[in-house]
From Swiss-Prot:
Assembly behavior: Homodimer.
Name this protein carries in UniProt: 2-succinyl-5-enolpyruvyl-6-hydroxy-3-cyclohexene-1-carboxylate synthase
GO BP terms in the entry: menaquinone biosynthetic process
Gene source species: Staphylococcus epidermidis (strain ATCC 12228 / FDA PCI 1200)
Presence of keyword Metal-binding: yes
Requisite cofactors: Mg(2+); Mn(2+); thiamine diphosphate
SUPFAM superfamilies with a match to the protein in the record: Thiamin diphosphate-binding fold (THDP-binding) (SSF52518)
Length: 556
């Protein structure tokens, strides 16, 4: 077998194996060394390829594809520093447990560590962030090489589904010439393999006595695409309030037991006596709720369908590595406990807080008012993708009357890659992106994917000319002299030119009334910039906090 035949067999077999284990989309960043696999993916009849020249943005775009399709997605780049640009998105995928398949092309072994161009040490380069990594052998025509690929892919597949989900990395050295035989596309197969299935049963004997206490809470964080119906069923039968993070996807169910205003209530001084807490999914966004969890004496139970439990903000008394639905289904045989008054107390606080928030939004002109207006525009067909810092916190506080799905990059919580991730989701969903100006600036080049692929998206850009969230931190008061330069960081950018560069329509709003009448479009790429003031935003938010403090004090 000559080199061309060996290369063709290897890369076509590798592409077929990825398909067999569920990969249907690949984001390719062009380069020479990645030629063999790029051609294999492009020639595969059932794999969709996306082309993105920026590796950093491409990797985040792939995360959006994963969130939108609920399937593993691969990214492919050439050798050298191109691969290093994947790092931020890999870190996000590891913490968020997203099945990202990282494929880095490499120089052959004889060109490593000898000063050859575009060659860096790529072996195990993502060790801190991936669940699996392997440096594949060079194509040599040996049947053992193909066996190695198949065996390693089988091992890696366990990290694409179930409780072990997360990123995997294959480093693939290729020797020139780099072009496979495209007349042998018959080697590209579309056979699927049996995927790992995970199901666990549990014993709740250790928590039976705890569950008989009256004052229990269910706290649900980001559930990604996990089923949550049994949480609602259990809550209904056992009269337990659910404190639901906006990323839990529970708020859109509009269930009477779902509490959405808890962040504002705890900020206002809420201090109800709680006997036990069942924490489900990823940690919640709310800083105030996390602070309460850290100091409460309540017995804490964590339920996460992961092999590595996220214990933040404080280790639980007991944890269960099982899906939420399986866990709550296991509790259905437990005796009922009278909790009507406990539940009603939470529901009353929720109702009063919602009334106060709604009244506030009638008169406010700050960023929250714009966010509240945006939420009112959303339908159940919409997906709201939210940037970090202030946007996600305003959504956390204000999202209580919408059927839209809500997503964000809340693994590493970075402000980079948000535009690209949202556009990846836009390939599968009707996406509205809510984002701040600094986060938008970080990832403006991600907009290229909308232009190249005619993706439909509405971007609401909240421009307070800097880092608005820092106004809420002690630095605002203790470092006044240096605050604006080090933390406020105004850029003075005119984003209208950005919209023009990437073929987005553009509208700028400097008053809330005009924005309220703006219509979101289901087709095309559109940017809506809202101009806000950081100091005014801080002042109006503090007024809302004060109003809610009065409610909590009167109620308790």
């Amino acid at each position: 077998m000559n080199h061309s035949e060996a290369l063709t067999e290897q890369v076509f077999s590798f592409a077929s194996e990825l398909y067999a284990y569920g990969v249907r989309e690949v984001v390719i960043s062009p380069g020479s060394r990645s030629t063999p696999l790029a051609l294999a993916f492009e020639a595969h009849p059932n794999i969709k390829t996306w082309i993105h020249p920026d590796e950093r943005s491409a990797a985040f775009f792939a995360l959006g594809l994963i969130k939108g399709s609920e399937k593993p997605v691969a990214i492919l780049c050439t050798s050298g520093t191109a691969a290093a640009n994947y790092t931020p998105a890999i870190a996000e995928s590891q913490i968020s447990r997203l099945p990202l398949v990282v494929l880095t092309s490499d120089r052959p072994h004889e060109l490593r560590s000898v000063g050859a161009p575009q060659a860096i040490n790529q072996v195990n380069m993502f060790s801190n962030y991936v669940n699996f990594q392997f440096d594949l052998p060079i194509a040599d025509g040996s049947e053992h090489t193909i066996d190695t690929i198949n065996y390693q892919m089988q091992i890696a597949s366990q990290y694409l589904y179930g409780p072990h989900r997360g990123p995997i990395h294959f480093n693939l050295p290729f020797r020139e010439p780099l072009t496979p035989d495209l007349d042998r596309v018959d080697l590209l197969t579309s056979v699927t393999k049996t995927l790992p299935h995970y199901q666990k049963s549990i014993s709740v004997d250790d928590i039976k006595d705890i569950l008989q206490e009256k004052n229990g809470l269910i706290i649900v964080g980001d559930m990604q695409h996990q089923a949550v119906d049994q949480i609602l069923t259990y809550s209904t039968i056992y009269d337990l309030p659910i404190l639901a993070d906006p990323l839990s996807q529970l708020r859109k169910e509009k269930h009477p037991n779902v509490i959405t205003t808890y962040d504002l209530l705890y900020r206002a001084g809420l201090n109800l006596e709680v006997d036990y807490v069942i924490r489900v999914g990823k940690p919640v966004i709310s800083k105030k709720l996390n602070q309460w969890l850290k100091k409460t004496d309540a017995y804490q139970i964590i339920v996460q369908n992961n092999d590595q439990i996220d214990v933040f903000p404080t280790p639980p008394h007991i944890s269960y590595e099982i899906s939420a639905n399986d866990f709550f289904r296991s509790l259905m045989e437990e005796p009922l406990v009278e909790r009507k008054k406990w539940l009603q107390q939470w529901q009353s606080l929720e109702q009063q807080a919602r009334i106060e928030i709604s009244d506030y939004l009638k008169h406010a002109t700050d960023e929250a008012a714009y966010v509240g207006s945006l939420i009112q525009k959303l339908t159940k067909e919409d997906t709201l993708f939210v940037g970090n810092s202030m946007p996600i916190r305003d959504v956390d506080n204000l999202l209580f009357d919408s059927e839209a799905s809500v997503y964000a990059n809340r693994g590493a919580n970075g402000i980079d890659g948000v535009v690209s991730t949202a556009l990846g989701m836009a390939a599968h969903k009707n996406v509205i992106l809510l984002i701040g100006d600094l986060s938008f600036y970080h990832d403006m080049n991600g907009l290229l994917m909308a232009k190249l692929n005619e993706l439909h998206i509405n971007i609401v850009l909240v421009n307070n000319n800097g880092g608005g969230i820092f106004s809420y931190l002690p630095q605002k008061r203790s470092a006044t002299k240096y605050f604006e330069r080090l933390f406020g960081t105004p850029t003075g950018l005119n984003f209208e030119y950005t919209a023009l560069l990437y073929d987005f329509t553009f509208k700028r709003f400097d008053n809330l009334t005009d924005f309220k009448y703006a219509e979101l479009s289901k087709m095309g790429s559109h940017m809506y910039e809202v101009i806000t003031n950081r100091d005014e935003n801080l002042h109006q938010h503090q007024n809302l906090y004060q109003k809610l403090s009065e409610i909590v004090n009167v109620t308790l």
